[in-house]
Regions:
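Active-site substrate-recognition segment that forms the wall
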Residues: 1-6, 43, 135-145, 152-229
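Dinucleotide-binding Rossmann-like beta1-alpha1 core, especially the glycine-rich loop
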Residues: 1-80
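Short beta-strand/turn micro-motifs at beta-sheet edges
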Residues: 39-40, 86-90, 205-208
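Short aromatic/hydrophobic contact patches that present stacked aromatics
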Residues: 49-51, 98-100, 186
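Helix N-cap/beta->alpha junction signal
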Residues: 55, 110, 162-163
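Helical element adjacent to the flavin cofactor pocket in flavoenzyme catalytic cores
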Residues: 60-72, 84, 91-157
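Conserved beta-strand segments of alpha/beta enzyme cores
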Residues: 75-77, 127, 176
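C-terminal catalytic lobe of FAD-dependent flavoproteins
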Residues: 76, 110, 203-204
Length: 229
């Protein structure tokens, strides 16, 4: 966790914020394009993300973060108490201020979206191999194959996208990536009596409520306990 703490220094935060913005700023239009090709557009919502506050003192704690977003080109809209109620009548009157990120989007069914994308991948000629990756075969600096429990797959290039397990795979290729697990937890409330109209973060409560196809998903707890915990 030492490297994690060091990454929280102000100069590092600014560097990482810029890098993350460049990495993710095109994700919504890109996933919308993929979803359209996979007949999954009905599972994508592009309605924004709302963060709500219980007064100015509550908002002041986040002011630096919002300024950092602004400097990196994130467009936001500040909503007063009345504007909040006009935007979403289901919100509690305890919230007196909100900030809307208009360009954000979300999926109402992650499993359904991935399933349809996978079907399109197969329909386009993709091949699915169920095996555990053990390592790689290289020739100089060139990648020649992926060693799996089902044999070696000959490749010219590969994308390492194995979540927290990517660290050991990258290490085998000589890349030392400061990567560890961040487990997230959520609950889903089926048939809620009321729900926010878009994903909404309670800033002081430190949780996000997201309307989903299967109900209202409430998330906000994470755990740093290592890969083998």
């Amino acid at each position: 966790l030492i490297r994690f703490l060091l990454a929280g220094r102000p100069n590092k935060v600014k560097e990482q914020a810029k890098a993350l913005r460049n990495l993710i700023k095109s994700t919504v239009p890109l996933i919308k394009s993929l979803a359209e090709e996979a007949d999954a557009s009905h599972l994508i919502r592009h309605e924004g993300h709302l963060t709500v506050y219980r007064g100015e003192a509550d908002f002041a704690k986040d002011r630096g973060g919002w300024e950092l977003r602004r400097l990196n080109g994130v467009r936001t809209q500040i909503l007063s108490a009345d504007a909040l109620r006009d935007f979403d009548p289901n919100l509690s009157h305890a919230f007196t201020k909100g900030i809307l990120i208009e360009e954000n989007g979300h999926t109402i069914n992650p499993q359904g979206l991935v399933t349809l994308l996978f079907r399109r991948f197969i329909a386009n000629g993709g091949e699915f191999v169920s095996a555990r990756v053990i390592g790689f075969e290289t020739e100089g600096r060139a990648l020649k194959g992926i060693t799996t429990t089902n044999g070696v797959l000959a490749v010219d290039a590969a994308v390492v996208a194995a979540g927290a397990h990517s660290k050991s795979l990258a290490n085998s290729l000589g890349d030392d990536i400061p990567l560890d697990t961040e487990r997230g937890y959520h609950i889903v409330i089926a048939n809620p009596e009321a729900a926010p109209r878009i994903p909404t973060t309670d800033a002081s409560g430190k949780f996000i409520a997201t309307p989903m196809e299967m109900g209202l998903r409430v998330a906000g707890t994470v755990e740093f306990a290592g890969l083998t915990a």
